[in-house]
Amino acid sequence: MYLSAERLAHANQAVKEAFGQCSVAWQAIPHWDTGDPGQLNVANGLLGGSAGFLSLGPPPSPPPPPTPTFQLTVAELIAPTPDALLTAVMAATKTLANFFDTDVLKQCFAAAPSPTNTLTFASTNAQDIQNSLIAARVLVENAGYRAPSCLITNTVGLQVLNQLVSGYYNIAEQILAAANINSLYRFEPLDGTAQTRVRMVLIGRRRRIGQGAAPDASPGEEPVDVAFSALPSLEVDGETSTGTIQFSPRVRYAARITDATGLVALKA
């Protein structure tokens, strides 16, 4: 109605690409499409008495950030080039990806069983960081996840991993190798704190998944995956009271923690 089919397809592709480039959870956690955009619930992937269902929905948008919508004039929409549309799409999609990551990664951090899979660093010196990450490696390997793991850390944690020993030697590569970690991401918040202290979550792997390669991985074998009933796309909301047209990038999903023993939360 407001956009040609070609331009709407172009905008939808921009949402998908921008979401994939901006979202840590999209890059680090395998996902799958339920195939039904109207689906409301999905199996949680657990067995026995723990089997149940999860609701599929958009990510929560905690105040004060508003829901990621944008408005454009008709003139901007029918312009010879889609520059205004694509600029607005990418800005709103970045916000949507942040809400998505906050929701999914907080769930991963909180799902690590306590006290067995919740580790506290004795200190933030190089040896203690390495010892704790090796201990996390042992936990996920004992749970059956022997492929190289994925580590997601906040900014303080990234600084600690990259501390200089003797004033010039960066230890990150050696620590990650010792802990059998082949992919590293930075995101915050990972829990409800102010993120002034180290927070990390280690995700075990059954199959080798490279940096940013989770979208191509099989989700059923990993300790966490994300089910989507609506993949990243653009919703045309309609005309506003000021005569502009409102659009919303959207996703509908549920994060499924299918085996919490494959997750380890680390903090200082």
Q: Model regions: which residues?
A:
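Flexible, glycine/threonine- and acidic-rich loop/arm segments that mediate assembly and lattice contacts
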Residues: M1-T102, D237-A268
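Sequence/fold signature of self-assembling virion shell proteins
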Residues: Y2, A25-P37, L164-A268
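Short, surface-exposed loop and linker segments with low hydrophobicity and enrichment for Pro/Ser/Thr
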Residues: L3, K16-C22, L133-C150, V156, ...
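Intrinsically disordered, low-complexity boundary segments flanking structured domains
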Residues: Q13-V15, L54-P59, A136-V140, N170-E173, ...
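Short secondary-structure junctions and interdomain/linker hinges
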Residues: C22-W26, F99, D103, V140-A147, ...
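Generic structural hydrophobic/aromatic packing signal, biased to beta-strands
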Residues: T67-L72, A136, L151, L184, ...
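Alpha-helical scaffold segments that mediate packing/assembly in large oligomeric complexes
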Residues: L72-L139
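Extended, solvent-exposed, turn-rich assembly/linker loops in the middle of proteins
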Residues: A112-A178
